[in-house]
Design a protein with these regions (language model features):
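Phosphate-coordination loops involved in phosphoryl transfer and adenosine-cofactor binding
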Residues: 26-30, 99, 129
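Iron-sulfur cluster-binding cysteine motifs and their immediate structural context
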Residues: 1-13, 51-54, 58-61, 67, ...
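A conserved short coil-to-beta-strand element within the FAD-binding core of flavoproteins
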Residues: 97-107, 118-121
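Short, well-ordered alpha-helix to beta-strand connector turns
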Residues: 27, 50, 93, 108-109
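Beta1-alpha1 glycine-rich phosphate/pyrophosphate-binding loop at the start
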Residues: 32-95
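Cysteine-centered iron-sulfur cluster-binding motifs in ferredoxin-type domains/subunits
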Residues: 1-8, 34-35, 39, 112
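Glycine-rich dinucleotide-binding loop and its adjacent helix/turn
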Residues: 9-24, 90, 115-132
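Short hydrophobic core segments
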Residues: 33, 56, 107-116
Length: 132
């Protein structure tokens, strides 16, 4: 079989040994803005490297837009991705501030903006009708 295998859930899949994840020389306070898959993966990686990580999201639910991708038939396994990332982050000591706006008072050393995507509404006639 030609080509590379990749994974929607784990970007390092099949490449774990190409770029070793090293501990940081200096521990930093890292602010992640967004609790979707990108934000949680960034939080997990930063925590694995030894940083103090806090994830902020103005929503009270993790990965709100991403979870909607699990609704179509055959895509249900996607609903477990956010839960798995969240658990991994919790084990690593990541702090979550859900339903919170970011403020200047936090004063992190580093900020990662992972505010995600917007839902795609296909251009289907009548899609906003009451019976749809």
């Amino acid at each position: 079989m030609k080509g590379n295998f990749t994974c929607l859930v784990n970007p390092r899949c099949t490449r774990e040994f190409e770029h070793e994840l090293l501990k940081a020389d200096n521990t930093k306070n890292v602010m992640i803005i967004g609790a979707g898959p990108g934000g949680l993966m960034a939080a997990r990686t930063a925590a694995q490297r030894g940083h103090n990580v806090t994830v902020y999201d103005k929503d009270t639910h993790f990965g709100e837009v991403f979870r909607s991708a699990a609704y179509p038939m055959g895509k249900g396994e996607l609903s477990t991705v956010i839960s798995a990332y969240r658990k991994q982050c919790e084990v690593l000591g990541v702090t979550f501030k859900m339903g919170k706006e970011v403020s200047e008072e936090a004063r992190p050393d580093t900020i990662v903006v992972a505010t995600g995507s917007v839902p795609l509404t296909p251009p289907i006639e009548g899609i906003n009708s009451e019976n749809v």
